[in-house]
Amino acid sequence: MNGINDKSMNNEALIERIVLNRKKALKQKGKKSTEGLEKPVAFWIKRDRLLNEIGKEFTIILRTRGCDWALGKTGGCSMCGYIQDSYKDTVPPENILSQFNFALESKRHEIEHDNNNYILKIFNSGSFFDEREIDKNLRTSLYNIIADIPKIKEVVVESRIEYIDRKKLEEMKTHLKDKYIEIGIGLETVNDYIRNNYINKGISFKEFQEAFELCKEYEVGVKAYLLFKPPFLNETGAIEDCTNSIRTLINMGINSISINPINIQRGSLVEYLWFQKRYRPPWYYSLFTCLKNAVKQEDLENVRILCDPSGAGTKRGIHNCLKKDCNGHMKNILENFVLNQDVRELYNDEFNCSCKLKYKLKNAYL
């Protein structure tokens, strides 16, 4: 036993359960009003790691129709509940542009008068290059606005690989000129079986590699999202899987790796398992073991390692025990590691909580 749950699940049964949970959650949510389409889901500024320095991120979450993978017959990924933030119907491009401008004008003065450089992250709970979410003309309008903001040095968007093509990469590079571009892709793991039978991602590692090589041709970076502790893995399996994924991606020359410990999102299969006490979000101890095993200081000269867990320290997010001091300490160490890109930060764990023994015993006997 390698720590990965040997009980394989029929993919059709997995999809059926994902779709059922999704429909139930969306029905309870009801139809969204058109009144909210002029403003984004959320936007914020906070400290973040840029390629070669500590700066700030300006994140905008746009409300679009949502992820086509989640809206389709497959029901989407087993851990994802972001479809509940979407409109689930076509959002006119002018509304999406208004959302972007609303966020930008709210923060423009702060950005322009800040000494820090910025990374702009545009998320839309789906794929930036999916024409049904964000069409070509809208993308061009966004590029032209961004190009005129000198403080923004890096731009990150997200997309499933089937929407990434030469034309879209060329357009983005042409309009954004000297800004560093990175495309976030939800790979989740380099293991095809786990990705498609436990997560229901619907892509192969080979397809990811092809997308990476295509982006490299256009000098566009790729940020691979890795899921830490997918459903049906225990802590040991999660450590093994993510360690292997990190090493594989580093060796292939990936630009950035963003490790995402699962947080329990509403309407997801993972929430269904969590309610049944068949899933627990990962421990910080497991994440730190993975990072210590997988990342060497010399790796960080060429690869950016990121990790900003949602719901950290709560029952639904990565946590040890639920003591504030314990989780707060681990969170601070993780933040310092990411900001400084220095593995020595991971060993700054002089805080010893009694829950560490409980964690070790659980891992030894489960």
Predicted region positions:
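Auxiliary Fe-S-binding modules of radical SAM enzymes
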Residues: 1-32, 36-39, 264-366
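Acidic (Asp/Glu)-rich catalytic clusters
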Residues: 107-115, 142-150, 170-180, 213-219, ...
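Conserved C-terminal portion of the radical SAM core fold
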Residues: 206-268, 288-308
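Canonical Radical SAM [4Fe-4S] cluster-binding loop centered on the CxxxCxxC motif
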Residues: 50-98
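Distinct, well-ordered alpha-helical segments
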Residues: 132-140, 165-174, 236
